[in-house]
Amino acid sequence: TACGFSPLQIVALRVLFAAVLMTAVIFKIDPKLLKIRWRDSWLFIGTGIFSLVFFNYCYFRSIESSSISIAVLLLYTAPVFVMLLSIFLFREKFTRCKMLALLSTFCGCTFITGIFSSKMTLTLEAFGFGLASGIGYALYSIFSKLALRRYNTLTITAYTFYFAAIAALPMAEPLQLFTLLADLRALIGAIAIALICTVAPYLLYTRGLQDVDAGQASILATLEPLVAAAIGIFIFGESLTTAKILGMILILSSIFILNTAKN
C-alpha cells in the first residue's frame, strides 16, 4: 500500500505474478502438467474465483465495515465450514479431537486478534462479509481436495492463480495498476509477495491436502495469525500481551491435539 496500491490491486498483483511464476516452474519441471480437461474448469473456478478472489473481496469489505480484528476472527471461522462440508463430501469423521482442536484454534485467534481489548462495533454488514470470507476461504480446501483426485499439486495451484487473475484484474483498475508497477520498488515488492506470500503457501497447503483430512488441514492453517503476531512482536516491536501469549498457546495446543489423535 506504500506504493499506492489498493487492497484489491494487491490481490490482483499477487495472483497475476503468482500465475507467471507457476507457469515458469511448470515449464521447467514438466510442461504436460499444464494440460487439463476443460470440463474440469469448474474445479479451478472454485479454487480461484469462488475461494481466492471471493474471500479476499469479502475480507476487505469486512475490514472497511468494522475492524481488522473482527475481520480476521470471522475469516478464521473457515475450519468450521471445511469440517461441515467434509463430513458430507469426503465422509470425514467429526471426532472429539477435531472439535477440541477447533475450539482451541478459534479461542486462540480471539485472544491474538485482541477483539476484546477495545470497544468495537459489529454491524450486520461486517458480520455478513466476514462470515462470507470464512466460507470463501473454506472453499479452497474443498475444491482442491476434489481436484487432487485428478491433478497434480502444481497444476491445481497454477490454474487457481490463472482463474483468480482473470477475475481479479478487471476489478483492480488495471490501467492504474500497471502504471504503478513502473516503479521498480513496486515491481520487486509484487514479485516478493507473489513468491513468498502466495505461491509458497498455496503450494504447500495443496500438497498437504493429499495426506491430511481437509478439516485438519484447515485447522493447521490457522498458524497464520500466530506467525503474524510473532512477526509483529519480534520485527515490528509490538507489545507481547498476556492475551497474545494465551492465544499462541491455544493455537499450538490445537496442533498438539490433532497430532496426538493421529498417532
Predicted regions and their residues:
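Hydrophobic alpha-helical transmembrane segments of multi-pass integral membrane proteins
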Residues: 8-25, 46, 101-107, 125-132, ...
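Membrane-helix interface residues
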Residues: 4-5, 66, 92-94, 151-152, ...
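Residue-level recognition of membrane-helix boundary sites in multi-pass small-molecule transporters
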Residues: 9, 70, 93-98, 155, ...
